[in-house]
């Protein structure tokens, strides 16, 4: 396959390019009978929308979603759901000099070597613009999981460049443009303003969480839940690392600490991040992703053109000084898509499993 479809039973096919007429996706496998409207999807799209603050790209796309199929009388029918988002604010002239040059850190060179042709306008198919359909599909998955299991998804930024962001409360995340769990974001605004003025960019660390998780999701050996989570999140533009639970901090832990001990009252900790043996435990899914600095910067960089000549590249156009800012709702969506797919797979195989012991409560947050 050509890598444009994600999922097994809840399958999402993504289509479009950054500067094409439209982008979108087709969802196949959504259970019938779920109430669904464009408003259910638009809320999450508005959270990742470009032009939403002065700290992100000023490409001003409304990202208004259109449901083309799969809905009748306000409910899913069980047939493919086609979602369309029209591109309305392309500025292709900004990329007129990019057709024969390779921007360092971008997919220009690798796409050209693979296909022998590439769309230089805004990165074409490799653009983060293509995460909008992912967020739209994730909103559908989120709604079904919330109705079926009470599962909720949330994410926040925990580091901006070299600045760690302390966790204060989840309520702060929706009240600032950084999706930061703090009340005061003045220092982060100053940091981004200085980066933009210097023609530079930075990376970010994003924490992602799913609460109200059902037990038993995951298909060993090769479709483990945590393996599929890592696979999905590594598919997000600019992600260079995924941690689940304690992640790399596990190296310095002792077994007496890392093992999530259990009592009749519940788990005492969640260093595993809600997954054991590739199967969900019912504890919260806890993970973090590392996002590299934005490759599109005003500062000149050495590169070559398609003829092999040395050139200097300075990227024009409208770009995010930190793509991690808008990655938060995208990471939520990808996690929701993985959980949704595994929930349907688990229900198909193990719906009749009955045990005498109820699920063990999760450790206190």
Curated annotation (Swiss-Prot):
Question: What's the protein here called?
Answer: Chorismate synthase
Q: Which GO terms describe its cellular component?
A: cytosol
Record pathway:
Metabolic intermediate biosynthesis; chorismate biosynthesis; chorismate from D-erythrose 4-phosphate and phosphoenolpyruvate: step 7/7
| Disulphide bond pairs | none
Q: Name one GO biological process term.
A: aromatic amino acid family biosynthetic process
Q: Which species is the source of this protein? A: Verminephrobacter eiseniae (strain EF01-2)
Residues that coordinate or bind NADP(+):
48, 54
Ranges annotated as spanning the membrane: none
């Amino acid at each position: 396959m050509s890598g444009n479809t994600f999922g097994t039973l809840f399958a999402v096919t993504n289509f479009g390019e950054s500067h094409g007429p439209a982008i979108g996706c087709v969802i196949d496998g959504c259970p019938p009978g779920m109430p669904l409207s464009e408003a259910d999807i638009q809320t999450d799209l508005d959270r990742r929308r470009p032009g939403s603050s002065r700290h992100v790209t000023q490409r001003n796309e409304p990202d208004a979603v259109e449901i083309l199929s799969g809905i009748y009388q306000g409910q899913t029918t069980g047939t493919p759901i086609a979602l369309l988002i029209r591109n309305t604010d392309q500025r292709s002239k900004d990329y007129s000099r990019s057709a024969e040059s390779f921007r360092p850190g971008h997919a220009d060179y690798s796409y050209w070597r693979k296909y022998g042709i590439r769309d230089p306008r805004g990165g074409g198919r490799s653009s983060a613009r293509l995460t909008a359909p992912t967020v739209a599909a994730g909103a559908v998955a989120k709604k079904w999981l919330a109705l079926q299991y009470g599962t909720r998804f949330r994410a926040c930024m925990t580091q901006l460049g070299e600045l760690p962001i302390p966790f204060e409360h989840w309520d702060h995340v929706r009240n600032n443009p950084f999706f930061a769990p703090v009340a005061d974001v003045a220092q982060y605004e100053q940091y981004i303003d200085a980066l933009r003025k210097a023609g530079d960019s930075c990376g970010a660390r994003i924490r992602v969480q799913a609460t109200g998780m059902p037990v038993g999701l995951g298909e060993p050996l090769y479709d483990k839940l945590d393996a599929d989570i890592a696979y999905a999140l590594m598919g997000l533009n600019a992600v260079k690392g995924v941690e689940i639970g304690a992640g790399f901090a596990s190296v310095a832990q002792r077994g007496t600490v890392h093992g999530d001990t259990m009592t009749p009252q519940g788990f005492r900790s969640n260093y595993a991040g809600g997954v054991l043996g590739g199967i969900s435990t019912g504890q919260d899914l806890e993970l973090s992703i590392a996002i590299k600095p934005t490759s599109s910067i005003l500062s000149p960089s050495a590169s070559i053109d398609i003829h092999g000549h040395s050139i200097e590249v300075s990227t024009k156009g409208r770009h995010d000084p930190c793509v991690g800012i808008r990655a938060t709702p995208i990471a939520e969506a990808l996690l929701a898509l993985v959980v949704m797919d595994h929930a349907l797979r688990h229900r198909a195989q193990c719906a009749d499993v009955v045990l005498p012991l109820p699920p063990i409560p999760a450790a206190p947050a």
